[in-house]
């Protein structure tokens, strides 16, 4: 299973697909993150912002039904996508990990550098793969995202993983 979007592409993902298919006769199944998490109409609605004099913080607002629905749907779709998979590859991509998922505030100028849908889809894929004992290969930005999901110890991260 390869997390990939044909419209966006990516040289790393393409080279992996070619190598595995030709040299190792491996069947590659592509998990398009847009099929796992449909485009979120208003991504900011998922987050609750709190400001005080010392620190501004942000967290995912799990009290609204839309948030729970998106995370639940992502997990169910990830289960289906990984149903007959022996491994999961998370390649790098041009987008940065959306820091809002980990309790950080991002600049309005940086919003376009993040892909919330892809981040949620890959979180769901990683969560399901680890539950099922499916090996995961992270490449470049994929390993960074994998480390954030599996190793980060913040309360926000733990809360997200519980809901996944």
From Swiss-Prot:
Key words, A-Z: Glutamine amidotransferase, Transferase
InterPro entries in alphabetical order: Class_I_gatase-like, Peptidase_C26
PROSITE patterns attached to this UniProt entry: GATASE_TYPE_1 (PS51273)
All copies of domain Glutamine amidotransferase type-1, residue ranges: 39-164
One GO molecular-function entry: hydrolase activity
Transferase keyword on record: yes
UniProt keyword Transferase, yes or no: yes
Transmembrane residue ranges: none
UniProt xrefs under Pfam families: Peptidase_C26
Protein name: Putative glutamine amidotransferase-like protein RP713
Biological source species: Rickettsia prowazekii (strain Madrid E)
Lineage of producing organism: Bacteria, Pseudomonadati, Pseudomonadota, Alphaproteobacteria, Rickettsiales
């Amino acid at each position: 299973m390869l997390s990939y979007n044909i419209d966006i592409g990516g040289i790393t993902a393409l080279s992996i697909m070619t190598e595995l298919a030709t040299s190792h006769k491996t069947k590659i199944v592509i998990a398009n993150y847009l099929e796992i998490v449909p485009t979120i109409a208003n991504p900011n609605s998922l987050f609750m912002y709190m400001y005080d004099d010392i620190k501004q913080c942000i967290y995912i607002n799990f009290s609204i039904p839309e948030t729970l629905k998106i995370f639940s749907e992502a997990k169910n779709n990830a289960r289906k996508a990984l149903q007959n998979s022996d491994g999961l590859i998370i390649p790098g991509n041009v987008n940065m990990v959306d820091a809002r998922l980990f309790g950080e505030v991002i600049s309005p100028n940086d919003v376009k550098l993040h892909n919330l849908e892809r981040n949620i889809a890959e979180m769901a894929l990683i969560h399901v793969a680890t539950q099922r004992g499916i090996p995961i290969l992270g490449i470049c930005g994929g390993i960074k995202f994998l480390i954030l999901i599996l190793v980060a110890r913040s309360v926000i991260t733990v809360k997200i993983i519980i809901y996944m």
